Amino acid sequence: METNCPNILYLSGITIEECLQTKKTATDTLNTNDDEAEVEKKLPSVFTTVSKWVTHSSFKCWTCHLYFKTVPKFVPTYMRENERGEIEMGVLGNFCSFSCAASYVDVHYTEPKRWEARELLNMLYRFFTSQWISYIKPAPSYTMRKEYGGKLSEEAFISELHTLEESISSKHIFI
């Protein structure tokens, strides 16, 4: 005996409108104007100064899986003086915030590499803000968002990220 059972997936707290919202896709990124597409092909693998760093990215943050409009952050893989006497940092990732970069380090690195990466991230924070800090609180997991079964709306999650970024400089100043 066959039953005609509809294919229904129920997610508590998720509305149809939230499911139907259009999100920017990889195809959308490829269909941008040539200048913007060219910029995305050439995201730098090396950081030297904030003034020479890119101001936007059309890719999602590696940690929170959201598109963002802030200046992209990254996990520094090394720091050295280059042949021109400039400080140079290796670049890994595309992050919307220092907190998301810190989360990535905490999840993907083990000691002693985790400690080294966190110290380099603190140095990068200084380059961007001119403030010495001792700790960057990691971002919450993307799984806290409703679309992943969590309790936070996308707006509440983003608000939490902004609060974390604002708290870095006010609570963790290096003395």
UniProtKB/Swiss-Prot annotation:
Kindly provide the name given to this protein in its UniProt entry: Uncharacterized protein B175L
Homology family:
Belongs to the asfivirus B175L family.
One of its Pfam families is zf-FCS
Q: What induces it?
A: Expressed in the late phase of the viral replicative cycle.
The upper taxonomy is: Viruses, Varidnaviria, Bamfordvirae, Nucleocytoviricota, Pokkesviricetes
Give the source species. Answer: African swine fever virus (strain Badajoz 1971 Vero-adapted)
GO molecular function, one example? Answer: zinc ion binding
